[in-house]
């Protein structure tokens, strides 16, 4: 089932009741994983200590510009087109990108137009693809991921691959070795799949088996930051800590991408 292999720290120290959950330093200066524990072989708990989290996102942005001047991650966030409220999850995650000197694009899609994603990827050239999945609205997404992975694995390995499990394992192994996207020069050959959302509350294992390279259960602010930094290997991760360190939401680009295809307030990209 292509489960991840990871060294897990056994001694764990978490904030106690009444302890401050605010990182007074503003952000971590080292790029290292938090303490982690294996939950019965199901997923990895990422136990971020206060010192591990970013709370001053503007200062963190300036810090990254100094120590990683060439670092500009680009993520395409994909959600469902069935909701009439703002997708604050995607906008919050987009805020992480903004404060890492990166770029986010957005698409809200349904089962009738999921294949439009191929055109978006060709035009936008993201380094990562992040899905926010809801229960009951997943089969067409997993079908798209299946075809995407088979096509990309065949292209990269220069041979015809027809079996999804073979393609999935090959790409996960490549992502593990590269610690992120697969490139040929400046060209992105494969943008790893990150899957989050309510679907992962119970079906996290299905998300991984059906193509997610990185599956995030629970709040994804801290995990996304460290995935983009190349700290995590493919696997299933859960952040149980209740830190309120959400950055400023990326509303401007979210609505720009919405209105590129619709002049309605609802603004669902490709929802026609």
What is each of the regions a protein language model found here?
Residues 3-272:
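Acidic, low-complexity intrinsically disordered segments
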């Amino acid at each position: 089932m292509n489960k991840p292999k990871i060294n897990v720290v056994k001694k764990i120290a978490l904030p106690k009741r009444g302890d401050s959950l605010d990182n007074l330093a503003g952000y971590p200066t080292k790029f290292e994983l938090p303490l982690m524990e294996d939950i019965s072989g199901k997923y990895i708990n990422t136990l971020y200590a206060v010192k591990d989290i970013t709370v001053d996102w503007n200062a963190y942005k300036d810090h990254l510009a100094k120590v990683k001047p060439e670092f500009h991650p680009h993520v395409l966030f994909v959600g469902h087109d069935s909701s009439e409220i703002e997708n604050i999850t995607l906008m919050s995650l987009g805020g992480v990108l903004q404060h890492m000197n990166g770029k986010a694009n957005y698409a809200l899609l349904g089962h009738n137009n999921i294949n439009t994603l191929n055109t978006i990827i060709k035009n936008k050239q993201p380094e990562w693809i992040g899905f926010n999945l809801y229960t009951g609205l997943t089969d067409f997404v997993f079908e798209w991921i299946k075809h995407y992975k088979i096509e990309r694995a065949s292209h990269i390995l220069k041979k015809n691959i027809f079996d999804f499990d073979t393609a999935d394992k090959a790409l996960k192994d490549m992502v593990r070795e590269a610690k992120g996207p697969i490139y040929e020069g400046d060209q992105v050959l494969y943008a790893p799949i990150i899957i989050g959302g309510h679907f992962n509350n119970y079906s996290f294992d299905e998300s991984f088996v059906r193509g997610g390279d990185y599956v995030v259960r629970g709040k994804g602010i801290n995990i996304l930051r460290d995935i983009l930094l190349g700290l995590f290997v493919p696997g299933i991760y859960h952040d149980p800590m209740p830190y309120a360190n959400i950055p400023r939401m990326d509303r401007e680009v979210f609505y720009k991408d919405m209105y590129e295809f619709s002049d309605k307030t609802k603004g669902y990209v490709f929802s026609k």
